[in-house]
Curated annotation (Swiss-Prot):
TM region(s), chain numbering: none
An example Gene Ontology molecular-function term: structural constituent of ribosome
Protein name: Small ribosomal subunit protein eS24
Region named Disordered: 76-98
Keyword terms, alphabetized: Ribonucleoprotein, Ribosomal protein
CC annotations in GO: ribonucleoprotein complex; ribosome
Ranges annotated as biased composition (Basic and acidic residues): 89-98
Biological process according to GO: translation
Family: Belongs to the eukaryotic ribosomal protein eS24 family.
UniProt keyword Ribonucleoprotein, yes or no: yes
Pfam family, one: Ribosomal_S24e
Amino acid sequence: MEFEITSDTRNELLGRRELRFILTYDGATPSRKEIRGKLCALNNINENLVVLDSLRTGYGRMQLDGFMRIYDTEEGRQRTERSYLLNRGEPKKEEEEA
């Protein structure tokens, strides 16, 4: 996996960085969890502060375009982001059988 950051802007009002990137990969499309982990390792940030918003692949390309937000604090992330984006890419919780 190779990352190329195409845009890195700072949003002071919401206390976050907004990154647009291009990911080049071999084989199957990587999962959101793999992408988030790799980007966090490269930028030396905590995974709890990151939200992957969109990942777009093109037909026949081994490349995807993505958009992610990196928050300054966990509270800012919880306050600003929609709940489905926070849960996206996480394993579903098993319902208890009664």
